[in-house]
Amino acid sequence: MRQFLDFEKSVAELENKIDELRKMSEPDGINLAEEIARLTDKSEKQLRAAYAKLSPWQKVQVARHAQRPHAADYIGTLIQDFTPLAGDRLFGEDKAVIGGIGRFQNQPVVVIGTERGSELESRLAHNFGMARPEGYRKAQRLMELAGRFGMPILTFIDTSGAWPGIDAEARGQAEAIARSIDTCLSAPVPVIATVIGEGGSGGAIALGAGDRVMMLEHAIYSVISPEACASILWRDPKQATSAAEALKLTAQDLLQLKLIDRIIPEPVGGAQRDPESTIRSVGDSIAAELPDLLSLSAPMLVAQRREKFLAMGRDSLS
């Protein structure tokens, strides 16, 4: 069953009406095709109009939509012969980070993603995509494996942030994130990172320090959630709408700021309306970026990648 967001209320009413008319026409053979077509056209126009002018806060809602395709969906579709790998070889397994080896269009790759889960049981198992230190250390292990065997790294980012629990802090959460960023920056192979939903804080950039950083059209990427930002600055989480505006967290803002390299278009109504075409678009974008990166030597890749992120700091201070 399709889930609608607050700003999609008028579209939801029309689609519910269309469903009712279809149910009425089936058993009695009543011809309601003309009315259904009229309402369908009206619904599509309203949906297109709504998504043509999304506010930053509305994009936050879209990015968090439960029916958007998750990392496991992208891996399952785009990666052939995928073999998952588990554990950090130091503490244990963290299911918030999934990863392994496989082939992307016949190119051997290492793939890593933050996985939220799709229903309550799997969300609990994956800790809603919030990784603990062992998750980031597993990611480091996979990146190092990729470097040893010369396999490009593909990451799929969808997390509200790293797990903030005391257990994670006790096991060195900050060090694990920092080390993961460093490992990503130092990998002697191409690294392509894609933000497919929510890219939250260090938990996201731990997998996002790539040669190419791409975002889906309605994804977000930020140092802090709008709610947390509002609580700190205004002492009022209800100011999240204003915080979302100020944070410049949309793909469009980040491309303009030169913090990302490519925006991947989504279907009208967001990735949740057509997961299959969204996944294909992401695959096409990866395929477009990978050949140029594969043509570069390992020292050149690392040098350009590090300079890219160092330049962000220099430009922001100048």
UniProtKB/Swiss-Prot annotation:
Family from the record: Belongs to the AccA family.
Domain CoA carboxyltransferase C-terminal: 39-292
Any one GO CC term of the record: acetyl-CoA carboxylase complex
Entry keyword annotation includes Disulfide bond: no
Name of the protein in its database record: Acetyl-coenzyme A carboxylase carboxyl transferase subunit alpha
Pathway: Lipid metabolism; malonyl-CoA biosynthesis; malonyl-CoA from acetyl-CoA: step 1/1
Gene3D superfamilies: 2-enoyl-CoA Hydratase, Chain A, domain 1
GO molecular function: acetyl-CoA carboxylase activity; ATP binding; carboxyl- or carbamoyltransferase activity
Main location: cytoplasm
Any one Pfam family match given in the protein's UniProt record, by short name: ACCA
Lipid metabolism recorded as keyword: yes
GO biological process: fatty acid biosynthetic process; malonyl-CoA biosynthetic process
Catalytic activity: N(6)-carboxybiotinyl-L-lysyl-[protein] + acetyl-CoA = N(6)-biotinyl-L-lysyl-[protein] + malonyl-CoA
Keywords: ATP-binding, Cytoplasm, Fatty acid biosynthesis, Fatty acid metabolism, Lipid biosynthesis, Lipid metabolism, Nucleotide-binding, Transferase
Job description of the protein: Component of the acetyl coenzyme A carboxylase (ACC) complex. First, biotin carboxylase catalyzes the carboxylation of biotin on its carrier protein (BCCP) and then the CO(2) group is transferred by the carboxyltransferase to acetyl-CoA to form malonyl-CoA.
Location in or out of the cell: Cytoplasm
EC number: 2.1.3.15
Complexes and interactors: Acetyl-CoA carboxylase is a heterohexamer composed of biotin carboxyl carrier protein (AccB), biotin carboxylase (AccC) and two subunits each of ACCase subunit alpha (AccA) and ACCase subunit beta (AccD).
The protein's enzyme class: transferase
HAMAP family associated with the record: AcetylCoA_CT_alpha
UniProt-listed SUPFAM superfamilies: ClpP/crotonase
